[in-house]
């Protein structure tokens, strides 16, 4: 039996993570969020439009409103329609001055821009325009009864625009997770090694809309690891540990999770970062995510597998770039996350001997690279299951897409 036979594919791990999240969210308390503080909030209600938006046909340019089917010249009515106006009814053969954003009079269906208008003796020379030119039609943005958001969606600042247009000032959201972040490792606990993972993970968790607390460290002692996780699960919704997730003599986190709850998976076919674990801790109605200790591997696997637990979605936004060097891969059956830096349209594999960080020649070495803090300078990551050829176009997930 291969050492890798018990690993699960990336997509399977993400599916299990999201399923665990959905079950967990069913019992989450709810709160109210104002539109000026939406980023990262998780919506707890469906949002359905109550009225058409816009509520009437509106002009998108300053100019003259008229009916496209009328023959010219068109008599200009001695009025002007503003956004706050109640427009008059136009008779056949008439036009009216109108401001951007103003409602069109009844019968009017077209607007001629002011700078394109020809006026003679109080009449608008009939412009050659298609029906609907420079008109924002009623309901073209939102139709009454249309569902625009579904409970569980993660909101951003951009959503405030549409929600405000719908007349909302607040929305119902789920309370963010309280997250306890615990570093494991005797060398960290005794101050001999710097904890590189916890600040990064706390920053990620905040960018995902939740409330992390750094809870210190614990040495590589099985009972103490279990007791600390148990203690934190009483106070937090989610416990995130770093280090101790492999199967070495001093890796106790998985044993602790087994003793305290139900491990949903352990080890994913991703390099770097494969020894991640997700567990449910039913005695405390909490979840635990165990992240491997090497910093770049920790970042990659947290962004790919842990992120969906907190956001409900997957990082899918990519940029297309040209890879500058051949990159060979190790064992088959893995998704490799290859860090790259950008220069114009090119993506240089960070870690390749021709890059500023030279840790491998022809074959990608996730083990060494995962420990390299210089790899934190990456602009993005290429996810691939096949070797890369210099000159090929590749999809890159920018690091901003993980946040």
Predicted regions and their residues:
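Short acidic loop-to-helix transition motifs that present clustered carboxylates
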Residues: 82-83, 217-225, 270-275
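Solvent-exposed alpha-helices and their adjacent loops that cap or buttress functional pockets
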Residues: 57-59, 68-69, 87-91, 104-105, ...
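Flexible glycine/proline-rich
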Residues: 256-403
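Flexible, glycine/charged-enriched surface loops at secondary-structure junctions
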Residues: 25-35, 212-215, 243, 315-320, ...
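Phosphate-interaction motifs
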Residues: 2-167
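Structural motif
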Residues: 64, 73-75, 94-97, 109, ...
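Phosphate-binding glycine-rich loops and their immediate beta-loop-alpha structural context
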Residues: 134-253
């Amino acid at each position: 039996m291969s050492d890798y036979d018990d690993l699960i594919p990336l997509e399977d791990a993400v599916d299990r993570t999201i399923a665990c999240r959905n079950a967990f969210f069913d019992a989450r308390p709810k709160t109210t969020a104002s539109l000026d503080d939406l980023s990262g909030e998780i919506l707890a209600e469906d949002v359905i439009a109550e009225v058409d938006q816009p509520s009437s046909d509106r002009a998108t340019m300053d100019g003259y409103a008229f009916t496209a089917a009328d023959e010219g010249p068109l008599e200009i009515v001695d009025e002007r329609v503003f956004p706050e106006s109640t427009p008059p009814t136009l008779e056949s053969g008439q036009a009216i001055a109108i401001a951007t954003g103003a409602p069109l009079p009844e019968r009017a269906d077209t607007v001629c821009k002011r700078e394109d208008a020809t006026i003679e003796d109080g009449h608008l020379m009939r412009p050659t325009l298609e029906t609907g030119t420079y008109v924002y039609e009623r309901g073209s943005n939102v139709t009454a009864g249309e569902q625009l958001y579904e409970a569980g969606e993660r909101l951003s600042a951009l959503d405030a625009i549409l929600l405000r247009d719908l007349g909302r000032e607040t929305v119902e959201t789920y309370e963010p997770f309280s997250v306890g972040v615990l570093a494991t490792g005797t060398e960290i606990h005794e101050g001999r090694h710097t904890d590189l993972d916890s600040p990064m993970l706390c920053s990620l968790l905040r960018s995902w809309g939740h409330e992390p607390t750094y809870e210190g460290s614990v040495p590589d002692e099985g009972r103490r690891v279990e007791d600390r996780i148990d203690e934190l699960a009483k106070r937090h919704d989610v416990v995130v540990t770093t280090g101790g997730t492999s199967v070495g003599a001093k890796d106790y986190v998985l044993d602790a999770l087994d003793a305290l709850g139900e491990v949903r998976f352990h080890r994913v076919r991703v390099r770097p970062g494969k020894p991640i674990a997700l567990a449910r801790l039913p005695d405390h109605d909490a979840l635990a995510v165990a992240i491997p200790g090497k910093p770049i591997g920790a970042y990659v696997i947290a962004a790919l597998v842990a992120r969906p637990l907190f956001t409900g979605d997957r990082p899918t936004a990519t940029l297309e770039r040209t890879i500058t060097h051949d990159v060979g891969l190790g064992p088959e059956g893995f998704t490799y996350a290859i860090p790259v830096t950008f220069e114009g349209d090119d993506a240089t594999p960070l870690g390749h001997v021709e890059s500023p960080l030279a840790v491998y020649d022809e074959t990608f070495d996730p083990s060494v690279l995962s420990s390299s803090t210089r790899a934190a300078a990456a602009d993005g990551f290429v996810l691939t299951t096949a070797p890369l050829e210099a000159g090929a176009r590749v999809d890159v997930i920018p690091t901003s897409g993980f946040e």
